[in-house]
């Protein structure tokens, strides 16, 4: 006999067919039915959304957790608590900034062991494609990573080397042989080196100096090279954290299998507004001008950009000290990404369904997370109850990641996550977390 374990009922439920009244029936952590609003069996626990919207949990495929090895920066306990508070139900952890980086099967096992019992949301893992491990990527693929990250410029940490363009082609061919996914930090070093030499004694504390040191040409040339490698090998390839809108022109190379993401900070801030010395805004690629920002929004509108993810890359406060060239480049934003994007999207006439497409569905499709990203029968019951119109200013002391450093401090954001559910289990509600972490560690092919 059919029987749901828990029901979620709301007047505004975001499904692939649009926003509708519905009652979502959950059995064994999966969505069994998306039923009419009044289809409510008796004696089954019922979560009433009221005026809140129910939508599929955010899938953030670009998170640096840094554990093991740099746990003073972040860790699985704090990163996944922050994720849950931000409506994120699945994260994929990047292979670098942990020690060791996830470039071998042994390193993957060590990272999974470090995460065991600490995950408040589901966690999967990317592998790394670095020069020393080319030729052995199939082993890491078979161990369950969702794809392979590489850099075409220095990564910022010594233990994760970058690839030359010839090595990029070799990695793409190797990954294409097992239909894997290559994800790329797409900046090449030569334009950066030339621009840096031209700066001479320009003020290193001025944001315009840092911006000039990483010109759009570095991204555009890298994306062209990545598209060429994809077309030559048939490798599925994804461009990470697109900043320069000019790079979009090179994605449509015939024969290339390409996708691209951008991040909340590129959709929110503009170079003209960043004060000198404000290194909390430093990231790579850099935040560019307002005109460029609006071109990224147009690419979201027409579908050329398929995903918006956080690139959560935290560090301790002391590492943000000094000039823009001394400070660590990265932002801690996994908890804020949903509200940031909703705030900016609604101001430009987008609907919440658009945000769900960019932040839940799109990342899940790109990473091959077949059970995630949509309120559909058979998917995991990863759900968020969201208040659209309630807003608040960001107080860094109230955030849940390890170090309260954020460029969003004092900024007013729309929306509020009221509750987050992973496979139908409440992991966050009204500022409180489940005592026992309910997240699982995911492997490619079983998620």
Model segments located where?
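Metal-associated gating/positioning segment near the N- to mid-region
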Residues: 52-118
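Histidine/acidic residue-rich metal-binding segments in metalloenzymes
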Residues: 135-150, 154-308
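His/Asp/Glu-enriched, well-ordered alpha-helical/loop segment
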Residues: 204-225, 229-234, 280, 301-308, ...
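Histidine-rich, glycine-flanked metal-binding segment
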Residues: 1-56
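Active-site loop-to-helix "anion-binding N-cap" substructures in soluble metabolic enzymes
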Residues: 68, 94-120, 126-133, 150-158, ...
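Alpha-helix-loop-beta-strand connector modules within alpha/beta enzyme cores
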Residues: 105-121, 168-184, 340
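Divalent metal-coordination and catalytic microenvironments
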Residues: 11, 24, 29, 51, ...
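C-terminal cap of metal-dependent C-N hydrolases
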Residues: 11, 323-326, 377-442
């Amino acid at each position: 006999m059919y029987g749901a374990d828990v029901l979620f009922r709301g007047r505004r439920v975001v499904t692939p067919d649009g926003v509708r009244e519905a009652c979502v029936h959950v059995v064994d952590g999966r969505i069994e039915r998306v039923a009419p609003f009044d289809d409510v069996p008796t004696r089954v626990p019922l979560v009433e959304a009221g005026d809140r919207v129910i939508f599929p949990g955010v899938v953030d495929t670009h998170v640096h957790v840094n554990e093991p090895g740099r746990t003073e920066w972040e860790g699985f306990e704090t990163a996944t608590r922050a994720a849950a508070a931000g409506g994120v139900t699945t994260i994929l952890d990047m292979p670098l900034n942990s020690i060791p980086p996830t470039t071998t099967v042994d390193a993957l096992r060590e990272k999974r062991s470090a995460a065991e019992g600490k995950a408040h949301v589901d966690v999967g893992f990317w592998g790394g494609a670095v020069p020393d491990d080319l030729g052995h990527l199939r082993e890491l693929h078979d161990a369950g990573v969702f794809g392979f990250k590489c850099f075409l410029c220095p990564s910022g940490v010594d233990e994760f080397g970058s690839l030359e363009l010839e090595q990029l082609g070799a990695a793409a061919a190797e990954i294409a042989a097992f239909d894997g996914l290559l994800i790329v930090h797409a900046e090449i070093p030569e334009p950066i080196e030339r621009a840096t030499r031209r700066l001479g004694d320009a003020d290193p504390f001025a944001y315009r100096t840092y911006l000039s040191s990483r010109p759009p040409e570095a991204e555009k040339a890298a994306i062209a090279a990545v598209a060429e490698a994809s077309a030559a090998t048939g490798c599925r390839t994804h461009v990470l954290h697109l900043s320069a809108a000019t790079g979009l022109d090179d994605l449509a190379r015939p024969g290339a299998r390409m996708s691209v993401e951008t991040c909340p900070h590129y959709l929110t801030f503009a170079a003209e507004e960043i004060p000198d010395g404000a290194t909390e805004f430093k990231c790579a690629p850099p935040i560019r001008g307002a005109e460029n920002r609006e071109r990224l929004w147009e690419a979201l509108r027409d579908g050329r950009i398929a995903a918006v993810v956080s690139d959560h890359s935290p560090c301790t406060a002391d590492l943000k000290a000094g000039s823009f060239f001394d400070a660590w480049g990265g932002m801690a934003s996994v908890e804020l990404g949903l509200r940031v994007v909703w705030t900016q999207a609604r101001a430009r006439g987008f609907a919440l369904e658009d945000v769900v497409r960019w932040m839940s569905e799109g990342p899940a499709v790109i990473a091959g997370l077949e059970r995630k990203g949509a309120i559909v029968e058979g998917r995991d019951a990863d759900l968020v109850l969201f208040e659209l119109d309630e807003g608040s200013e960001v107080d860094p002391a109230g955030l849940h990641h390890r170090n309260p450093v954020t460029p969003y401090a004092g900024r007013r954001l729309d929306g509020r996550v009221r509750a987050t559910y992973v496979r139908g289990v409440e992991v966050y509600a009204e500022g409180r977390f489940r005592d026992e972490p309910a997240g699982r560690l995911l492997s490619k092919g079983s998620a």
